[in-house]
């Protein structure tokens, strides 16, 4: 009886530790969805797409322009050599997407990234860190930046765009897409999804954000998100 009691207590203790670990890494937001998907029957796949959504921040941790430009130079000098050595099934080499932060605007950096884009090695899209923001301010920031990317740097030239439209894709710099952090930090815009759509955003690549508490329960999926104002 004592032996069984000890085993039971060890099992309970182990379960408590596992649950604590799951909650500490915010896995409880998405683990159920993941386990349900694991039970699904595998489907045959013939084509694999690899999407790289790089939160590209040459000024991360520094305000030194020379340091940022040294980081840029490494990409400009080495990425075409590395990517150019590899081809996919249709003969195309890897193309890296630089999601560039609005608040780090540097025309020289973006000119260099635009050159990589013209050579077929890259693309540039929109990335933003903000806090305590408003829908009006966010809208102005997005429209101003996308216009600059196209008119000043020749970027965001997308096939199928309607006249006057500047389509773009987006990553939220602090993962708090649509003001999703429980403490309300690093965004502030409850209707951010609507603002993104109305300013030309065609897809958001913020997720996955685990182990952040901004991670949604829906994982490993391509889907239409639905926001709720307020």
Label the predicted regions:
Residues 2-230:
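Catalytic alpha-helical scaffold of carbohydrate-active enzymes acting on polysaccharides/glycoconjugates
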């Amino acid at each position: 009886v004592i032996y069984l009691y000890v085993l039971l207590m060890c099992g309970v203790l182990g379960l408590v530790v596992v649950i604590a670990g799951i909650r500490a890494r915010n896995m409880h937001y998405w683990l159920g969805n993941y386990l349900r998907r694991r039970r699904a029957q595998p489907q045959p796949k013939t084509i694999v797409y690899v999407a790289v959504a790089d939160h590209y921040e040459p000024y991360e941790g520094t305000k030194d322009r020379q340091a940022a430009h040294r980081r840029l130079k490494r990409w400009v000098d080495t990425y075409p050599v590395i990517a150019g050595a590899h081809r996919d099934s249709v003969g195309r080499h890897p193309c890296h997407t630089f999601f560039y932060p609005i608040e780090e605007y540097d025309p020289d950096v973006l000119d260099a990234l635009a050159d990589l884009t013209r050579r077929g090695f890259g693309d540039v899209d929109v990335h933003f860190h903000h806090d305590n923001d408003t829908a009006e301010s966010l809208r102005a920031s997005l429209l101003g930046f996308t216009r600059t990317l196209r008119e000043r740097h020749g970027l965001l030239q997308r096939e199928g765009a309607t006249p006057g439209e500047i389509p773009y894709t987006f990553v939220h710099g602090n993962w708090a897409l649509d003001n999703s952090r429980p403490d309300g930090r690093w965004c502030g815009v409850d209707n951010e999804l609507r603002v993104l759509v109305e300013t030309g955003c065609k897809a958001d690549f913020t997720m996955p954000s685990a182990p952040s508490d901004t991670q949604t329960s829906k994982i490993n999926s391509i889907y239409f998100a639905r926001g709720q104002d307020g």
